[in-house]
Amino acid sequence: MFSNRLPPPKHSQGRVSTALSSDRVEPAILTDQIAKNVKLDDFIPKRQSNFELSVPLPTKAEIQECTARTKSYIQRLVNAKLANSNNRASSRYVTETHQAPANLLLNNSHHIEVVSKQMDPLLPRFVGKKARKVVAPTENDEVVPVLHMDGSNDRGEADPNEWKIPAAVSNWKNPNGYTVALERRVGKALDNENNTINDGFMKLSEALENADKKARQEIRSKMELKRLAMEQEMLAKESKLKELSQRARYHNGTPQTGAIVKPKKQTSTVARLKELAYSQGRDVSEKIILGAAKRSEQPDLQYDSRFFTRGANASAKRHEDQVYDNPLFVQQDIESIYKTNYEKLDEAVNVKSEGASGSHGPIQFTKAESDDKSDNYGA
């Protein structure tokens, strides 16, 4: 069955197919006849059943005939489209006149040719039209029953009462503040003399209380045992440490009375330097010793030293390639004249070698004191 939106099919000669006519044979009638004549072998390709089958090619005459027939059909379609596009029967002429002042002698009228708008001959047929969709009615549609209430849809006061669900009433708490009727209260059943309290409630409460006491007692006993075990462990550690300390004292030969032995007082660096100088037979003043023992700390300079080193040569003309006015390490060379070598000084103090010198530079002499008191070394 073909779609109703497509043009009816035609034969190669241009005749309309009779398959869509009203007197066509229904497919349901021919179904049985087609099924009887069709076999399974008809669906098998011929080359598969017979590999040596030779299919002859079309002759030149047949090819030329098919080409001419196709070319003539296409030419007829093109000529029909061009004939419609070249149709100028709808054209007409219109005379238009403009209004101008009377003193101007001008020809204000001119002719206009009105022609209908040219349409594209290759546009599809259904542009701008809605697709006409035909829906065939279904067969054997069952009638859907309509369910509704008898009478009007207005609800009365009786309808909510029928669907109302009462709230749950608790015997222990009333968070929403509901009013409980007397017949639904728990204490209402106690008024009846026939009802008696079961002894099981009293036994249950006593059993729970005894179990609670027993559990508390077990926890208390466990904590006590744990505390005693920790105390015994601490005592064992202390006794072991005491034993180790006694063994160390015995091996070292120290008295076991427990008296604290004070270490020997270490001599200062100044005293050691004075002793070394006395042993070498040199007279060195305390000022030199103190200067060697205590290194002078110079703060970092926060200014450019070149401002103070040029002096009288500030106005002297220098060479254009001379960037700096002084050598790079001139200040370091000046300081190294009277600078003390601390590494060699430490070696001399510790090793007490005979040929080691404690300082570099000239020896500074101080005035002798008038007191007759002499130091320990006779200096």
From Swiss-Prot:
One of its GO terms (biological process) is generation of catalytic spliceosome for second transesterification step. It holds the Pfam family SKIP_SNW. InterPro entries: SKI-int_prot_SKIP (IPR017862), SKI-int_prot_SKIP_SNW-dom (IPR004015). It comes from the Eukaryota. Residues 1-10 have a biased composition (Pro residues). GO terms for cellular component: nucleus; post-mRNA release spliceosomal complex; Prp19 complex; U2-type catalytic step 1 spliceosome; U2-type catalytic step 2 spliceosome. Residues 368-379 have a biased composition (Basic and acidic residues). It is found in: Nucleus. Its main location: nucleus. Keywords: mRNA processing, mRNA splicing, Nucleus, Spliceosome. Belongs to the SNW family. This is Pre-mRNA-processing protein 45. It comes from Saccharomyces cerevisiae (strain ATCC 204508 / S288c).
